[in-house]
């Protein structure tokens, strides 16, 4: 039966600095690299043989996937990159320190932007420091200027349905190395998590989440490979 392994990228430099990262291409810290390797070691220890991997076009996710595959002894596994697996676009909050933003706009407003399901932050102004339309990896793409978790899911799911789900339905074991919110979108879809509950689902960095699926891609079981760093999971069935 198909198996899906979700792996959130290891700690990035802006995670460490408590900044809204979103689509900014920030690299892993040394700790983040270690988390990615540990994730791969856990995959190897669990005896999971991957058939294919998917990741975003952001360096922190790409490197997490590569480091994990190498540590798992499976660096030969083909990897497909697509921008639709990117992190949520934080719009006008991009690059800002989270604590300073709360002081400026109020804790309640920032919490709404971060944790509501369908309320996005203010849009990113065009032509500024973080104008992703200038980045050639997004050439010809219709890009958002901000996203809520709801619109992140709207972006992720078509790619899931056309690229990843068919591989799983063929019985493959798939790794998706991506980001907290793009992975949260997949979890919401698979487990049918209510809108008001998904914003509270946390996915820890560098800890492989293994989801066993039936032929219809309904979860039959789910577990984190590092139990000591696990977070609560949605109910199966």
UniProtKB/Swiss-Prot annotation:
The active site is at residues 9, 87. It is an enzyme of class 5 (isomerase). Its EC number is 5.4.2.11. The keyword Manganese does not apply. One of its GO terms (molecular function) is phosphoglycerate mutase activity. Substrate binds at residues 8-15, 21-22, 60, 87-90, 98, 114-115, 180-181. InterPro entries: His_Pase_superF_clade-1 (IPR013078), His_PPase_superfam (IPR029033), PG/BPGM_mutase_AS (IPR001345), Phosphogly_mut1 (IPR005952). The keyword Isomerase applies. SMART domains: PGAM (SM00855). It comes from the Bacteria. Pathway: Carbohydrate degradation; glycolysis; pyruvate from D-glyceraldehyde 3-phosphate: step 3/5. GO terms for biological process: gluconeogenesis; glycolytic process. It catalyses: (2R)-2-phosphoglycerate = (2R)-3-phosphoglycerate. Keywords: Gluconeogenesis, Glycolysis, Isomerase. The record marks 179 as: Transition state stabilizer. Pfam families: His_Phos_1. Homodimer. Belongs to the phosphoglycerate mutase family. BPG-dependent PGAM subfamily. This is 2,3-bisphosphoglycerate-dependent phosphoglycerate mutase. It comes from Caulobacter sp. (strain K31). The lineage of its organism: Bacteria, Pseudomonadati, Pseudomonadota, Alphaproteobacteria, Caulobacterales. The gene is gpmA.
């Amino acid at each position: 039966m198909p198996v899906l392994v979700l792996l959130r990228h290891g700690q990035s430099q802006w995670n460490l600095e408590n900044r809204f990262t979103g689509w900014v291409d920030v690299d892993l810290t040394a700790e983040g690299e270690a988390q990615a390797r540990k994730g791969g070691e856990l995959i190897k220890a669990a005896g999971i043989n991957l058939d294919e991997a998917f990741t975003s076009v952001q360096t922190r996710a790409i490197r997490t996937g590569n480091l994990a595959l190498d540590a798992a002894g499976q660096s030969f596994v083909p990897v497909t990159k697509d921008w639709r697996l990117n992190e949520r676009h934080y719009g006008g909050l991009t690059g800002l320190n989270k604590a300073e933003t709360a002081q400026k706009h109020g804790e309640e407003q920032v919490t709404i932007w971060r944790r509501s399901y369908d309320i996005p932050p203010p849009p990113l102004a065009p032509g500024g420091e973080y104008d992703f339309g200038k980045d050639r990896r997004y050439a010809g793409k219709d890009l958002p200027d901000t996203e809520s978790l709801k619109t992140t899911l709207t972006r992720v799911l078509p790619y899931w349905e056309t690229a990843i789900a068919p591989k799983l339905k063929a019985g493959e074991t798939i790794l998706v190395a991506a980001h907290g919110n793009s992975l949260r979108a997949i979890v919401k879809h698979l487990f049918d998590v209510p809108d008001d509950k998904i914003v509270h689902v946390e996915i820890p960095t560098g800890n492989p989440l293994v989801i066993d699926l039936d032929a219809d891609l309904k979860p039959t079981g789910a577990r984190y490979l590092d139990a000591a760093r696990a977070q609560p999971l949605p109910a199966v069935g």
